């Protein structure tokens, strides 16, 4: 197996474009026939993905794996932090949750985490021809430098070259790049191979004097300037994207609970031309919806209390009274049930609380998470069976207390099991499946059930592929990658 130099992409800030840049590089290398894998030593994210072997990684790394045309693997994101309280996060190591830690607890744990990070990087290096690495936040965070595993701490330990990307759309790009480099140690500065400027709009000739100044002052080349790409529809790692009200469309409202998880579930709705998806925040009402969906949550008890404090439970009651449909996904499904018990104190003090009482299920939280990819059939009332795909990430086990319809049959290696519940009035549907809208047939079935006439799904896979190829094409035209991989790319004018 031929080997190519690994490369780490670090950023001057969060949301500088690291995730997209790594995805684009993975696709460019894959298009050249190179077996490439993405890697992020440490990630903090609201959204996670399930691997085939039942592990949990950041959804951004799953997206990057798709860009590389390889299957997601737990070693692509060995340390994942999922915030579940204001001061704490669940720590997931090589795909498995170990415990919840506060900031100081994790700070102390990082020195123990580095061996896992290096083990995962070694696995990818041995099994792929190239590894493209994504940093986290900024390498110049002075307060986070001790025992760093996410940025230069990892780069030094693994001895990998680095490029630094900055978002010019935010302003202050030269200060960001110059200042970030200046705050690094001499050995760290030496492994920086160049800069990338992201999201540029306008005439690049006006930028050239600044680029020349930056190269002269730092002695580092600018590898290129990537233009702002409009309408780039990729999963958001953390930020919730909402659109403005568009009259005449089918209105879907999602209450934003404090610990919302996997809001990427709603991307197929957000992108559909006939749907107006609205994320409803604190102090806002769910009234006026055609369809209400309770999202997943990383702290179901606390978020159920929050739903009641916002009087969204009253909005749901009124919505149902006037013939509306309601759906719950994962934690939202649990909230719709009769009871939620936490005897082990998974989410806080041990307790048992009443749910919203719309579905005849009772849920008990358990220490072991259910982490699995799912494929099966969805049968909604008065509809034919359709294909459904998704993934499960939950600690709760729900028991049906009545004879309500279970609409999803899941095929496993050993047997068949069932997921979800629909009430006898056919107005409420709950499921544990994240990604339930991604399969076009399931999308159409659920939205037809909810009341959208002549529903025709969009293909999320095609949309993602188009976006990744756009990114790769733009980067190939904009960057001089011969400075990193001279055996793969021809010299290109950087600007």
From Swiss-Prot:
Pathway it belongs to? Cofactor biosynthesis; adenosylcobalamin biosynthesis
InterPro entries named in the record: Class_I_gatase-like, CobQ/CobB/MinD/ParA_Nub-bd_dom, CobQ_GATase1, CobQ_N, CobQ_synth, GATase_3, P-loop_NTPase
Xref: PROSITE patterns: GATASE_COBBQ
What is any one GO biological process for this UniProt entry?
cobalamin biosynthetic process
**Domain of life of the source:** Bacteria
| Entry function | Catalyzes amidations at positions B, D, E, and G on adenosylcobyrinic A,C-diamide. NH(2) groups are provided by glutamine, and one molecule of ATP is hydrogenolyzed for each amidation.
Family as reported in the entry's similarity comment: Belongs to the CobB/CobQ family. CobQ subfamily.
Give the protein name, as stated in the record.
Cobyric acid synthase
**Species annotation:** Aliivibrio fischeri (strain MJ11)
Gene encoding the protein: cobQ
